[in-house]
């Protein structure tokens, strides 16, 4: 019995000693980076609206836009809540509308308005684009070194270079698909605005130049196609 008491005393003393020693271990404090930057990856989803449409042209379905990339943050003040953002990204945009792009025997693209006067039925007509984009943003936010959750308003300018464009037509005359049509304006640019809290932000893009080159006109009326896009949606910023 005496042996058990001595053993119990030794174990109890050792346990209490360990607990006391563990309690003396200092807990490291949270490191705060006063020179933080909001370098961010971004992902966006938009509904694409066509404006400045030629006579008889209309959108015929949901037109989707997707974008993603990375933006480097360059703070401009000591508080670091005002900054410039420089980035690079990729975008995909589809446009469902009734401008039928058909190439003639000389491989020249013609642009037909598929309105009520068009004599053949069709079930699908759209074009879509792939672009490399360079966004530039002026950034205002309520961020602090301690928090990653804040309100933001980012205004900016975006330049995009189309490296691929594709048109699709499906109807009574058959299925027509063309790649890299010369009539598209390869250089596209516009104004941007994103505003919101934390990850979720509303996004607007307003194009400043038309989708097609200046010499592109409708086939029958010879009307210049000056249409451009407004994109409305959501953009997500991820640290």
Task: Enumerate the predicted regions with their spans.
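Bacterial Sec-dependent N-terminal signal peptides
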Residues: 1-27, 234, 238-239
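Short loop/turn motifs that connect adjacent beta-strands in outer-membrane beta-barrel proteins
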Residues: 25-39, 75-82, 143-151
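Predominantly the C-terminal beta-signal and adjacent terminal strand-loop region
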Residues: 36-39, 179-239
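Structural signature of outer-membrane beta-barrel domains
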Residues: 48-50, 89-95, 141, 160-164, ...
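Glycine- and aromatic-enriched membrane insertion/assembly motifs of diderm outer-membrane
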Residues: 49, 58-117
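Outer-membrane beta-barrel transmembrane strands
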Residues: 53, 123-145, 204
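Extracellular/periplasm-exposed beta-strand and loop segments of Gram-negative cell-envelope proteins
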Residues: 54-61, 96-129, 162-190
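Residues on the lipid-exposed face of transmembrane beta-strands in outer-membrane beta-barrel proteins
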Residues: 68-74, 88-90, 134-140, 155-159, ...
């Amino acid at each position: 019995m005496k042996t058990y008491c001595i053993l119990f005393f030794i174990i109890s003393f050792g346990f209490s000693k360990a607990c006391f020693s563990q309690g003396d271990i200092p807990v490291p404090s949270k490191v705060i980076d006063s020179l933080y930057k909001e370098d961010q990856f971004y992902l966006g989803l938009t509904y694409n609206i066509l404006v400045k449409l030629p006579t008889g042209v209309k959108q015929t379905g949901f037109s989707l836009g997707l974008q993603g990339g990375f933006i480097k943050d360059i703070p401009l003040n000591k508080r670091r809540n005002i900054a410039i953002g420089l980035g690079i990204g990729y975008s995909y945009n589809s446009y469902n509308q009734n401008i039928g792009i058909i190439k003639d025997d000389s491989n020249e693209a013609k642009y037909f308005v598929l309105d009520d006067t068009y004599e053949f039925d069709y079930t699908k007509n759209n074009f879509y684009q792939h672009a490399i984009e360079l966004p530039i943003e002026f950034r205002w936010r309520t961020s602090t070194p301690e928090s990653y959750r804040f309100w933001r308003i980012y205004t900016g300018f975006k330049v995009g270079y189309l490296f691929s464009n594709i048109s699709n037509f499906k109807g009574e005359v058959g299925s027509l698909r063309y790649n890299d049509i010369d009539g598209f304006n390869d250089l596209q640019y516009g104004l941007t605005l994103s505003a919101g809290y934390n990850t979720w932000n509303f996004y607007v893009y307003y194009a400043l130049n038309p989708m097609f080159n200046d010499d592109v006109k409708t086939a029958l009326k010879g009307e210049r196609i000056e249409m451009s896009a407004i994109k409305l949606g959501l953009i997500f910023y991820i640290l």
